[in-house]
Amino acid sequence: MSTKQSFKIAGVDGCKGGWLVAIVEVKGKRHSFELTCMPPPITNFSDVLWATKGCKVVCIDIPIGLSDRDRWRCDQKAKEILGNRQCCVFFAPIRPILSYKRYPAANRTSRCLSGHGLSIQSFNIMDKIHQVDSVMTPNKQKRFREVHPEVCFWALNHGQPMQRKKTTDAGRKDRMRVLAPIFQNLRGIVTKDNRAKGVKVDDILDALVAAYTAGQVVLDNYSTLPARPQRDGKGLRMEILCPAACDPKFGVLKPPHLSC
């Protein structure tokens, strides 16, 4: 997908009130990144599809591709990479429980079918996972790709996890330090006056690092977790993307046509 022309990409993060969408334009031969639009949170994922229709790639912080029974997914690889910060990654729910509305029943069924319980954190975002899964197809997945912001920050931070929580002042500063060389006026973007109601600074930073990763996908400068993803029962790849990294220890590789 490499290109020398300007193009638009997007990063999407789940937040209070729905989905936060950061639409970014990548300009010129030097590939500068400029935030062009960040509307108030969008309630339904179907509207996210419409809002990002002009974007080449959209990276989303939500599981895409789900197992029906086992923990086939990429979550374990992400945990291994993040080491002592692996608590940031939650195992995705199995597809048969997506419509469950009560945690005890979802947890019980998950344990029965997969041998593993369901974390309360995963249950709390299960409605969003269901929204995405209900519309996602292998063809749509060519443009809509899964990321985990902490894995993206790991890649941008020279293979070192962010050690401080994103909800703390110190953690936000750590992540802004990584993103500041990429996005001009980052401080202005995250100021309270420029944030929609209910949107937190860490929501914006997660959406921006997802958007940056989308740009790297267009430029063929990205990695996948695992290096050779499996497909689920719908034919969706179970993978997490991040900016290019090369760490055979964890099975993180550039695409096959790029050398490490």
How would you label these PLM feature ranges?
Residues 2-260:
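Phosphate- and other anionic-substrate recognition elements at nucleic-acid/protein interfaces
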